[in-house]
């Protein structure tokens, strides 16, 4: 059974390990767990869970499964206690997370598939080798560790109206919601999932845990097919609503945090900000906290994310124009775009298009723009 005393005990125990992360005031407050040790909130639950293991459990070594962040938390916690650790990671986990996990002292087993496949492999190895399993979210001590964020928020943000929390398996939001609602039932707790991995949303909709057949999202940290049993029960009781955000919205939020707040967030960590940016949760006129749950994004992925975020916000436009394939037409198009104040970065000619006109081509122009209104103005100018 979860008790608030466990959360205070976890906070005391974790004071030796974790940092109390900063609050940055913006139109909303940002709880920057991306600045936490290992770059994610996951170190809280992992380290507290390991600290509560018996000597016998520690002697067997620990095993965990993870999309990446829990892995680093378990590796750090296990190494700090002198315990051997083995982590099962999805083969598609970002290279940065795989290497960081090894760097904290863990052995790594890469498993084809997604988080749920890594989970099954970890259970098999636990049964075969006798390891102690550290669940990434469906465990009372893990939830208590994550819930210390809720205790920090009560201390840091007075008169808080609502908190927006990324949701994968549900460990973070369960801990935060339990702590906040126990201390102040009037605080609203909203969860956010990627539309391509909305297992908790679906489960709450049908009033029972649902396992999705497939999941896919850039937010690898919350790419989970099925929520936990305990986390589902807590979310059902304490969470006010859970919404979804699209891939483009996540990318736009990552870009917003990077460009405006100078904060590097991974996809999962940016979902809370995306929900506020795109009006998925009712926050107007309220004091709201967005938990930026992690910042472990692979640099190669970040480049793609920035491009998608720029496109979503109208900072990059891809314009297709059908024109006669003759000298001077390209100059005309370029002149219109230049006059509108956009900067052309790439031009592609397609003479093999499906146009009914034989002597025509499709011109694809990629240009830097200011916003969506600017893109619309350029399109109108080209039509004229």
Q: How does the language model describe each region?
A:
Residues 1-384:
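PLP-dependent amino-acid enzyme catalytic core
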């Amino acid at each position: 059974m979860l008790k608030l005393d466990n959360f205070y005990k976890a906070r005391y125990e974790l004071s030796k390990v974790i940092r109390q992360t900063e609050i940055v005031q913006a139109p909303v407050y940002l709880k920057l767990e991306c600045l936490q040790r290992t770059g994610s909130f996951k170190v809280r639950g992992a380290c507290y869970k390991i600290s509560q293991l018996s000597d016998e459990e520690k002697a067997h070594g620990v095993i965990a499964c993870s999309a990446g962040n829990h892995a680093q938390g378990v590796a750090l916690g296990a190494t700090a206690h002198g315990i051997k650790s083995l982590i099962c990671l999805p083969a598609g986990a970002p290279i940065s997370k795989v290497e960081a996990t090894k760097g904290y002292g863990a052995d790594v087993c890469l498993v084809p598939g997604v988080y749920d496949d890594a989970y099954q492999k970890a259970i098999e190895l636990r049964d075969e080798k006798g390891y102690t399993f550290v669940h990434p979210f469906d465990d009372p001590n893990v939830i208590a560790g994550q819930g210390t964020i809720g205790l920090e928020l009560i201390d840091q943000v007075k008169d808080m109206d609502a908190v927006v929390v990324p949701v994968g398996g549900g460990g973070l939001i369960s801990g935060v919601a339990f702590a906040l609602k126990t201390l102040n039932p009037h605080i609203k707790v909203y969860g956010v999932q990627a539309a391509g991995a909305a297992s908790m949303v679906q489960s709450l909709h049908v009033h029972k845990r649902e396992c999705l057949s497939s999941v896919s999202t850039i937010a690898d940290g919350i790419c989970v097919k099925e929520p936990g049993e305990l986390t589902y029960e807590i979310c059902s009781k304490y969470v006010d609503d859970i919404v979804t955000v699209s891939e483009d919205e996540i990318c736009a939020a990552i870009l917003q945090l990077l460009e405006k707040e100078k904060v590097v967030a991974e996809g999962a960590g940016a979902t809370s900000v995306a929900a506020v940016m795109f009006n998925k949760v009712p926050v107007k006129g309220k004091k709201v906290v967005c938990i930026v749950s992690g910042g472990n994004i692979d640099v190669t992925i970040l480049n793609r994310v920035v491009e998608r975020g720029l496109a979503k916000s109208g900072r990059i436009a891809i314009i297709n124009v059908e024109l006669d394939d003759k000298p001077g037409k390209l100059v005309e198009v370029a002149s219109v775009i230049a006059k509108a104040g956009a900067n052309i970065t790439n031009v592609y000619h397609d003479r093999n298009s499906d146009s009914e006109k034989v002597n025509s081509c499709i011109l694809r122009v990629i240009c830097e723009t200011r916003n969506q209104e600017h893109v619309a103005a350029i399109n109108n100018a080209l039509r004229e």
